[in-house]
Protein backbone atom coordinates (compact mmCIF):
# COMPACT_ATOMS: atom_id res chain seq x y z
CA UNK A 1 0.00 0.00 0.00
CA UNK A 2 2.86 2.40 0.74
CA UNK A 3 4.07 2.29 -2.87
CA UNK A 4 0.61 3.08 -4.23
CA UNK A 5 0.15 5.84 -1.65
CA UNK A 6 3.50 7.41 -2.53
CA UNK A 7 2.70 7.35 -6.24
CA UNK A 8 -0.83 8.70 -5.74
CA UNK A 9 0.50 11.42 -3.43
CA UNK A 10 3.06 12.54 -6.01
CA UNK A 11 0.37 12.80 -8.70
CA UNK A 12 -1.91 14.81 -6.40
CA UNK A 13 0.88 17.18 -5.32
CA UNK A 14 1.94 17.71 -8.94
CA UNK A 15 -1.61 18.16 -10.28
CA UNK A 16 -3.20 20.21 -7.49
CA UNK A 17 -0.15 22.04 -6.16
CA UNK A 18 -0.95 21.11 -2.56
CA UNK A 19 1.52 20.41 0.21
CA UNK A 20 2.45 16.75 0.55
CA UNK A 21 1.56 16.90 4.26
CA UNK A 22 -2.06 17.70 3.31
CA UNK A 23 -2.39 14.49 1.27
CA UNK A 24 -3.69 12.00 3.83
CA UNK A 25 -5.79 8.89 3.28
CA UNK A 26 -8.80 10.73 4.71
CA UNK A 27 -8.35 13.85 2.56
CA UNK A 28 -11.21 14.55 0.16
CA UNK A 29 -10.10 15.70 -3.28
CA UNK A 30 -12.75 18.43 -3.43
CA UNK A 31 -13.33 19.52 0.18
CA UNK A 32 -9.80 19.16 1.60
CA UNK A 33 -7.51 19.50 -1.41
CA UNK A 34 -9.47 22.11 -3.38
CA UNK A 35 -9.99 20.07 -6.54
CA UNK A 36 -12.88 20.84 -8.86
CA UNK A 37 -14.69 18.30 -11.04
CA UNK A 38 -12.23 18.74 -13.92
CA UNK A 39 -9.28 18.25 -11.56
CA UNK A 40 -10.78 14.97 -10.35
CA UNK A 41 -11.28 13.74 -13.93
CA UNK A 42 -7.67 14.62 -14.74
CA UNK A 43 -6.45 12.90 -11.56
CA UNK A 44 -8.31 9.74 -12.54
CA UNK A 45 -6.73 9.86 -16.00
CA UNK A 46 -3.26 10.28 -14.49
CA UNK A 47 -3.89 7.39 -12.10
CA UNK A 48 -4.93 5.23 -15.06
CA UNK A 49 -1.67 6.08 -16.83
CA UNK A 50 0.53 5.69 -13.74
CA UNK A 51 -0.92 2.31 -12.76
CA UNK A 52 -1.66 1.05 -16.29
CA UNK A 53 -5.33 0.40 -15.61
CA UNK A 54 -8.72 1.60 -16.74
CA UNK A 55 -11.05 3.11 -14.17
CA UNK A 56 -14.68 3.02 -15.27
CA UNK A 57 -16.78 6.17 -14.94
CA UNK A 58 -18.92 4.36 -12.39
CA UNK A 59 -15.88 3.48 -10.27
CA UNK A 60 -14.37 6.94 -10.69
CA UNK A 61 -17.49 8.51 -9.18
CA UNK A 62 -16.88 6.48 -6.01
CA UNK A 63 -13.31 7.78 -5.59
CA UNK A 64 -13.70 10.84 -3.37
CA UNK A 65 -10.68 10.61 -1.06
CA UNK A 66 -7.02 9.75 -1.33
CA UNK A 67 -7.75 6.53 0.58
CA UNK A 68 -10.49 5.61 -1.90
CA UNK A 69 -7.99 5.95 -4.75
CA UNK A 70 -5.29 3.92 -3.01
CA UNK A 71 -7.73 1.17 -1.99
CA UNK A 72 -9.16 0.99 -5.51
CA UNK A 73 -5.70 0.70 -7.06
CA UNK A 74 -4.62 -1.95 -4.59
CA UNK A 75 -7.79 -3.97 -5.21
CA UNK A 76 -7.12 -4.02 -8.97
CA UNK A 77 -3.45 -4.99 -8.90
Swiss-Prot record:
Annotated pathway: Lipid metabolism; fatty acid biosynthesis
Molecular function terms, GO-annotated: acyl binding; acyl carrier activity
GO cellular component terms, semicolon-separated: cytosol; membrane
Keyword Isomerase recorded: no
Gene3D superfamilies in the record: ACP-like (1.10.1200.10)
Domain Carrier: 2-77
PTM comment, free text: 4'-phosphopantetheine is transferred from CoA to a specific serine of apo-ACP by AcpS. This modification is essential for activity because fatty acids are bound in thioester linkage to the sulfhydryl of the prosthetic group.
Sites of O-(pantetheine 4'-phosphoryl)serine modification: 37
Keyword Translocase tagged: no
GO BP annotations listed: lipid A biosynthetic process
Compartments it resides in: Cytoplasm
Keywords: Cytoplasm, Fatty acid biosynthesis, Fatty acid metabolism, Lipid biosynthesis, Lipid metabolism, Phosphopantetheine, Phosphoprotein
PANTHER family, alphabetized: ACYL CARRIER PROTEIN, CARRIER DOMAIN-CONTAINING PROTEIN
Function summary: Carrier of the growing fatty acid chain in fatty acid biosynthesis.
Family, per entry: Belongs to the acyl carrier protein (ACP) family.
Record protein name field: Acyl carrier protein
Gene name as annotated: acpP
Amino acid sequence: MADALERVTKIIVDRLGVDEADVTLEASFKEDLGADSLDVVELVMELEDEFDMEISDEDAEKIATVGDAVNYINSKQ
